[in-house]
């Protein structure tokens, strides 16, 4: 995603500067696991991270010129603002941002042609479709040729709104899959061609095979990223994705422990959960093949 600014100089000066200094580091370091990953023995893991955090946040004394110890006022910052074009330049994208098109006046010959065709444009304006109008067939209930034109436009907009609501209702009929996010990520990775995907590809896999996440709030994406970073079931591979001008993103793959954990948890699912899982999939016929059952 590229952002356009009227004046980029103030933002370029923020390179290698700290930001969000009021971020609560103590609360951030507590997020060792998510609620859906709260398995047996998670208390020990939380205590281990808590002890590590307490040890790292202890104030180290420093000796002053008089020989007395003073407290160090330095506080680490979690966020560092960097310019990605300087830190990780993408070789396939030489021109980072396409130039803005210049607004120039049309040639004189074109202006004369437009002035001559002005009456034709006025006559065709009434027939131009609006932004919310679609091609309606005879079976559309919102169409009535005897209505005034402005009422027909409102009816067309209402008909499109009803069709959109009908589509959302169909998506809402899909149940949520009875799997935690760690298993969803493992399912996406084990069904990839080379066993590795980036974050966006994992999102696409989940939305494609489980329609529930197509209309779910985007908070589930944050949970996916959190599990990738903190779960021992995943690790970064040595490959990078950088094509079609997109920023390079790292690839993730399953660890040996992650494969074993996914296989054991899938075989431990009850018949009721398997029934719900099958109903939540867009293509339930691929369930045995995708899950290795």
From Swiss-Prot:
Biased amino acid composition, Polar residues: 106-119
Keywords: DNA-binding, Nucleus, Transcription, Transcription regulation
Compartments where located: Nucleus
Segments for region (Disordered): 104-152
Start-end of DNA-binding region: 176-273
Taxonomic superkingdom: Eukaryota
A GO molecular-function annotation: DNA-binding transcription factor activity
CC per GO annotation: nucleus
Protein name, UniProt field: Forkhead box protein N5
Gene field: foxn5
């Amino acid at each position: 995603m590229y952002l356009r600014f009227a004046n980029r100089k103030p933002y370029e000066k923020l390179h290698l500067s700290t930001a969000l200094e009021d971020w609560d580091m103590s609360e951030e370091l507590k997020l060792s696991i998510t609620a859906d990953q709260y398995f047996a023995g998670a208390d020990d893991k939380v205590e281990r991270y808590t002890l590590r955090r307490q040890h790292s946040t202890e104030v180290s004394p420093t000796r002053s010129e008089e020989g007395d110890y003073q407290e160090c006022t330095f506080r680490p910052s979690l966020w560092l603002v960097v310019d990605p074009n300087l830190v990780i330049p993408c070789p396939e994208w030489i021109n980072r941002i396409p130039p803005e098109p210049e607004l120039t006046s049309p040639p004189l010959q074109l202006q004369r042609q437009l002035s001559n065709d002005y009456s034709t444009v006025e006559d065709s304006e009434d027939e131009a479709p609006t932004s919310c109008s679609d091609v309606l067939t005879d079976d559309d209930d919102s169409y009535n040729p005897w209505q005034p034109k402005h009422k027909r436009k409102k009816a067309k907009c209402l008909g499109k709104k009803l069709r959109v609501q009908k589509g959302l209702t169909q998506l809402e009929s899909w149940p949520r899959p009875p799997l935690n996010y760690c298993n969803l990520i493992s399912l996406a990775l084990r069904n990839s061609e080379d066993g590795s995907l980036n974050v966006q590809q994992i999102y696409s896999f989940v939305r494609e095979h489980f329609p529930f996440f197509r209309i779910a709030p985007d908070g589930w994406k944050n949970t996916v990223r959190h599990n990738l970073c903190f779960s021992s079931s995943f690790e970064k591979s040595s490959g990078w994705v950088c094509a079609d001008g997109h920023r390079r993103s790292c690839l993730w793959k399953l660890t040996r422990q992650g494969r074993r954990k996914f296989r054991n948890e899938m075989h431990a699912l009850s018949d009721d959960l398997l029934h719900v899982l099958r109903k939540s999939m867009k293509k339930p016929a691929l369930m045995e093949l995708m899950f290795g059952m």
